[in-house]
Amino acid sequence: WRDGTYEASESSFSHGYKNYVRIVVENGYIVDAHFDAIPEEGEKMKYLASVLGDYGMTANSDAQAEWYVQADRAAAKLLEMQDPAKILGSGGEVDAISGVSVTIAPHFQLAQKALSGKRR
């Protein structure tokens, strides 16, 4: 990958948020990935709201971990694999990632969009 910081977000909101990714590439490698969601109303991004306990995923559902924890696990998978295409299936789906039960495929699709045309 070409060095740089790359971002992408969905064009429209769904359930009050639109997904967003930021990817940092250094020396040709993905060294940081941040999966988040921009709120339609309010100030807090979904990641921050989750960290602060305002998103309440485990309190309000049978989720195994808060949203930010699952987002970090998914982002770690991208750092491990170094290519969103290696994680996304041919139909745009994501196989199970240990400890992630939220729908995460849109973030990997956005990662692919952010990195489009950035190969060395």
Please identify what each model-predicted range represents.
Residues W1, S9-R120:
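Active-site- and interface-proximal helix/loop "cap" or "latch" segments in soluble metabolic
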